[in-house]
Amino acid sequence: MVMGIFANCIFCLKVKYLPQQQKKKLQTDIKENGGKFSFSLNPQCTHIILDNADVLSQYQLNSIQKNHVHIANPDFIWKSIREKRLLDVKNYDPYKPLDITPPPDQKASSSEVKTEGLCPDSATEEEDTVELTEFGMQNVEIPHLPQDFEVAKYNTLEKVGMEGGQEAVVVELQCSRDSRDCPFLISSHFLLDDGMETRRQFAIKKTSEDASEYFENYIEELKKQGFLLREHFTPEATQLASEQLQALLLEEVMNSSTLSQEVSDLVEMIWAEALGHLEHMLLKPVNRISLNDVSKAEGILLLVKAALKNGETAEQLQKMMTEFYRLIPHKGTMPKEVNLGLLAKKADLCQLIRDMVNVCETNLSKPNPPSLAKYRALRCKIEHVEQNTEEFLRVRKEVLQNHHSKSPVDVLQIFRVGRVNETTEFLSKLGNVRPLLHGSPVQNIVGILCRGLLLPKVVEDRGVQRTDVGNLGSGIYFSDSLSTSIKYSHPGETDGTRLLLICDVALGKCMDLHEKDFSLTEAPPGYDSVHGVSQTASVTTDFEDDEFVVYKTNQVKMKYIIKFSMPGDQIKDFHPSDHTELEEYRPEFSNFSKVEDYQLPDAKTSSSTKAGLQDASGNLVPLEDVHIKGRIIDTVAQVIVFQTYTNKSHVPIEAKYIFPLDDKAAVCGFEAFINGKHIVGEIKEKEEAQQEYLEAVTQGHGAYLMSQDAPDVFTVSVGNLPPKAKVLIKITYITELSILGTVGVFFMPATVAPWQQDKALNENLQDTVEKICIKEIGTKQSFSLTMSIEMPYVIEFIFSDTHELKQKRTDCKAVISTMEGSSLDSSGFSLHIGLSAAYLPRMWVEKHPEKESEACMLVFQPDLDVDLPDLASESEVIICLDCSSSMEGVTFLQAKQIALHALSLVGEKQKVNIIQFGTGYKELFSYPKHITSNTMAAEFIMSATPTMGNTDFWKTLRYLSLLYPARGSRNILLVSDGHLQDESLTLQLVKRSRPHTRLFACGIGSTANRHVLRILSQCGAGVFEYFNAKSKHSWRKQIEDQMTRLCSPSCHSVSVKWQQLNPDVPEALQAPAQVPSLFLNDRLLVYGFIPHCTQATLCALIQEKEFRTMVSTTELQKTTGTMIHKLAARALIRDYEDGILHENETSHEMKKQTLKSLIIKLSKENSLITQFTSFVAVEKRDENESPFPDIPKVSELIAKEDVDFLPYMSWQGEPQEAVRNQSLLASSEWPELRLSKRKHRKIPFSKRKMELSQPEVSEDFEEDGLGVLPAFTSNLERGGVEKLLDLSWTESCKPTATEPLFKKVSPWETSTSSFFPILAPAVGSYLPPTARAHSPASLSFASYRQVASFGSAAPPRQFDASQFSQGPVPGTCADWIPQSASCPTGPPQNPPSSPYCGIVFSGSSLSSAQSAPLQHPGGFTTRPSAGTFPELDSPQLHFSLPTDPDPIRGFGSYHPSASSPFHFQPSAASLTANLRLPMASALPEALCSQSRTTPVDLCLLEESVGSLEGSRCPVFAFQSSDTESDELSEVLQDSCFLQIKCDTKDDSILCFLEVKEEDEIVCIQHWQDAVPWTELLSLQTEDGFWKLTPELGLILNLNTNGLHSFLKQKGIQSLGVKGRECLLDLIATMLVLQFIRTRLEKEGIVFKSLMKMDDASISRNIPWAFEAIKQASEWVRRTEGQYPSICPRLELGNDWDSATKQLLGLQPISTVSPLHRVLHYSQG
């Protein structure tokens, strides 16, 4: 292929004066000869072709010189083609100018605008930047630029040209959503001073930030050239604007124009028509009706409409309408009949009220503003079309040509109209745009012009006046026939004329219908509109006329208003006043000039007055005692508060008590104890309760009233308090804990905000007796608090930063209590609970104890801190301040305070911009910027005034959505009262921007539209905060919370799907109905009343990706009670008050009306205070009653509320001296225990080696001589025992280096025939050798720290002597206790002091003769040394020392046989043991497999010891308590015995035990050693898996029947027959692989993981089994993926590794774990 002569050449063509034909030829010649051409000069250009050298700017000349671009004229192209070679450009200089040389300054104005400062040189120029390039009007080869764009920014500038003419330029920043190559275009269009010639320039940018910066700099450059900014567009400048900009300029033209007389008369007429209609109907002026009341009234209309359809009685309908007339007071009497026609009229009335209030927003202080103000308030361009013009005649002809009536129509006037948002949002791309007619009463025209045509709220056949409307559902109706539209255009009351609208309607694909369809709310699928075909002679339909219906407002664009009349209309003269001049309105502003003037109040503010806090003598009347009992389950709590106070006055008083709570609380009980009487409060509707209270006080009876005055204030009116009487008030409430990361916080406030107190204190309920007010719980009164805590996961820590606590706890349960002498000061009470596995979702289901009802609670706290980027580094914060007229007054001052405080919290990494908005908007910067100082931004906020007209927030949102951020996210903080114009468009823009923009709303003002702001935040993936003027003390925290969320990743669009198997069940009652967005460390609680539901699915979007998680529970795990019922009821009530029941405000209000009766019902059933209900109780008093009544025994009443569910444990943190002085029970009180004979039974134990934590020496350890031991008795508390015996205990220890519990014993350690040398290495073998030698008798156990993912063992219960008074318990180890056993009296010389589990002795006494060190058989002496560990946990192990050296009758007797080589003589103290093992047991898991994680009683037995090889180790007997749970009793109700053989080949091999009738204990081979490998591998199928058969269970020591039963209960049947069998095979194969893996790891063969056991590198080590393992591993990997997350779903464990280890007994398991039943299932 021959290359053209212009190959590798790129020509920039600037041939302004070349004829059009030659331009085309030039372009064609370049292409045909291998060249390329461009109209813009860029670094790739090799040549520039000019027909006049003067067209080059200085910047272009510099660029040409720098890039070595050749300059030539067009002849260079043509002569090079003629000679077929590339000629030298030196001979082809550009053409010189003609004879007339323009002045120097004219060259700049007639050529391209200089932009030297804008475009960087080629070294720094980005690839996406194209310099501004000039185009002449005659230039046709303009590069392709997207035409489907929107204008984000625009400006017009003017300057005087050289010849005295005006030069104008319009600069636009255009945004294209579809074009990736040209997303942002800066376009400028110049009109030269001759008024004829124009030129264009453009620049393309890739990001909104670059485009905004370029736009700003370009305007500045134009100013340097003498251009001045114009505020309004002139007609000439308007012609320069793009078509899209001209649509936006409708409002500009409207605001800058003066009114013609015709337009002024029209505005006055429609305004008078609307106001006159309202004045005729309403009892009070329209501007005194709240828009919130209008929304409620519209909701009532929808409710009445539904009731009408359901056939409610006329009486019931009238009752419902009464509420409507209360909200919207009417003149005259109410109509007796309620029908759809009445509802339609009232709906139109509500819309008219709403429209007029919105229109009047700009002139709130003027009841009758001038015509120009009314016109501008309409926000709609209206122009009069002169008669006899072509446009007038054309429109008149179009209207009349489809008039099928015989009555003539007289078209009086035509007005051209245009609305900005209709022009910008009109869906013309749907096609099939037709001009159609819409008729409406004159009084509705103001609203239509202001907000456009809306979808009707009540859509039904409205009777004779409107024949067809509603026949095609809820849409906007049009007709192409004037005769049809006239039916709806009624003559006005003002001048008797009618009005008609002509609209462009984008019908798109229209579906013809012949039958009515009332259910339509949108066009049928695949269509954009519907057409009701009119009936003709040949076609039978349901429609009299042609009806066109659309269901989207953006398919409509108004064009004309037709003013007309018909024969019979009475035309009246209407002469509006000539008051047309607009007076500038200047509201009064605060004169604050400093940021300090806008400071928010501190969170804690002291009261400025003591009013109401004193008695007649001025003395405070504080409470005497405050006692709190509480119960915390998961993250919810129930709290009971007891308050005691006395009337020290000699006269009866009315006392009122302010009870402070946070907004999460719900009071659910109120009781009073006075004069020996118990008064229980009842929930009644508020008016009824208050009336009952007043009557009781008047009659001299005692009365108690409690109501909710604010979210965090409850008021108790105690009523008549007799002189010297003591009253105990008992209040019960439920609440939710605050969550800070993985820490749950319970807080009990001591006082409330002073302004809330003062308001409640000053309210007067009765005037009979003196009123004394008690303002706070008290500062120095007696205070006590006891709470139980129960978690589904391990409690990491518990502490209070306000009080010193004592506590007792297990892994998942705890009881805490304040120390004696505590008081409650202004800090309140705070409790912090460290939670593990807090991010696991969970489900709680509670059955009601008295009725058929189930309440569900979902707990969901997403861990958003994982794998999410730091949002703050690339985020923008846009503070949008509402400056509309409705914000005037104190509301605007508060808005400024909030905006300024938010500004002060913006991070250094965040970009910031401030926008003031009203009808228009003003921004601080042209694009968000990093700011080093807040001064400029703060001054911008402080300078704002509420004079910007209406609340057109949609314009600001549209602008921001067009200039979306290129990186990171944008966060809008909206500060507004929520009375927005065009709410639907605003909502659409918020949803459209959600991928890159989040919206956080701050509601201000007592009349704020909270629903609108809440729904904007919900759809904008943000959160709404309402700033209540009554609770300013919380404003700082509210703002800080919002600003924290701005920098946090979020989880939005959260939804819950409840599993309801019965399709006929009613719709689930869920709260919140619309789940708000969640942010870092947020916790979601979703409640519901859903019957028979055990599973729910949570769906959410995180970074616009959908995530799902399934949570479930089982029938067995359902609890019984009322706490979750009360919480669910409170959540529904809260959602009723502050939630989103429906996106549409009217439907939301209708649902509120529907739910009101349910809310009252829930309130009464669950004893919950709401805005409709109160507690009231009346105490009837006798006249002869003693003036000094009996004081109630407060301590007894409080003691009845016992929350301590760990009574068997001792308090931690209690002073040691206090423990020593406690009364002790004598050991003789313990019951007599005997051992029943056991039948022959084999008991398998765990295979894991018994190991102990290697203790570390703590620096806190102090060695101290024991000295003389005082006599003591049984039932010692922990502190005293530890102090006396120098032993310590901790419940949970960190694992360290381990050693086997039973070690090889050297000969020197067994040289004597004493029990102790054998016992020492057996039990205390972790001790150093020196310790073993000197103190072989010391007993200590260590424990492992428990690790649990969800739940852990319930703490063991311990019992005092009174619980064993019923005689001997069968199955104990009494018969195995030796007659006498020596007791070790001290620890080793160097006892370890790191957390470990020691044995603690209790229940014994030593006589005074026992003060000397105890001598043991064999000559060993224990050294009397001790160590104390006050920081360690409470004891779990208890050894009892009998008080009597005689045989222990209470525990039976032991009679050694004659063959026994050793006989123990009675010694100073006999030893028995009452040992309880927690989950992290003192004994390793291997020792307690039968009672894994379960409390058992351990009796330490000793046998005679001969030689090492023939010796028998100590025997441990396990005994269950008679109060253990039923599911454990099967295994634990009888004793089982363990004997460990000390084998020299293996450190610790556990055995099967046979307990025979002759009490003989036989040691059997280790269960793993006994495994027949051949038999195990023979059970493998050809495909590589194992079946879960009893044969396999025997090999694995697993009860397969129990496992089958367990899986069936957990729902494995739902997988189907095939799925169930496959899953059982998978479980069996996993178990075998884990079994093989564990066995081989003992031989030193280590596998990477359970799923990768077929590693070829280890094949040589197990050639006999490798193929089987490989085949099984491959099958497992193929199959496991079919069952994702099946382990947690079936509650087997977190994953396969942990599940199989627990099933095989290789890993400890909690007693509360569902698998515990499997492991303890009877092997029968």
Swiss-Prot record:
The modification Asymmetric dimethylarginine is found at residue 1476. Residues 369-573 form the PARP catalytic domain. It is found in: Cytoplasm; Nucleus; Cytoplasm, Cytoskeleton, Spindle. It comes from the Eukaryota. Residues 97-123, 1408-1452 are annotated as: Disordered. GO terms for cellular component: cytoplasm; cytosol; extracellular exosome; membrane; nucleoplasm; nucleus; ribonucleoprotein complex; spindle microtubule. Its EC number is 2.4.2.-. PROSITE patterns: BRCT, PARP_ALPHA_HD, PARP_CATALYTIC, VIT, VWFA. Keywords: Cytoplasm, Cytoskeleton, Glycosyltransferase, Methylation, NAD, Nucleotidyltransferase, Nucleus, Phosphoprotein, Ribonucleoprotein, Transferase. It catalyses: L-aspartyl-[protein] + NAD(+) = 4-O-(ADP-D-ribosyl)-L-aspartyl-[protein] + nicotinamide; L-glutamyl-[protein] + NAD(+) = 5-O-(ADP-D-ribosyl)-L-glutamyl-[protein] + nicotinamide. The keyword Glycosyltransferase applies. SUPFAM superfamilies: ADP-ribosylation, BRCT domain, Domain of poly(ADP-ribose) polymerase, vWA-like. The modification Phosphoserine is found at residues 1236, 1335, 1504. InterPro entries: BRCT_dom, BRCT_dom_sf, PARP4, Poly(ADP-ribose)pol_cat_dom, Poly(ADP-ribose)pol_reg_dom, Poly(ADP-ribose)pol_reg_dom_sf, VIT, VWF_A. Residues 876-1046 form the VWFA domain. It is an enzyme of class 2 (transferase). Gene3D superfamilies: 3.90.228.10, BRCT domain, Poly(ADP-ribose) polymerase, regulatory domain, von Willebrand factor, type A domain. Residues 607-735 form the VIT domain. A motif (Nuclear localization signal) lies at residues 19-25, 1237-1249. Residues 1-94 form the BRCT domain. The keyword Lipid metabolism does not apply. The modification Phosphothreonine is found at residues 101, 333. Belongs to the ARTD/PARP family. This is Protein mono-ADP-ribosyltransferase PARP4. It comes from Homo sapiens (Human).
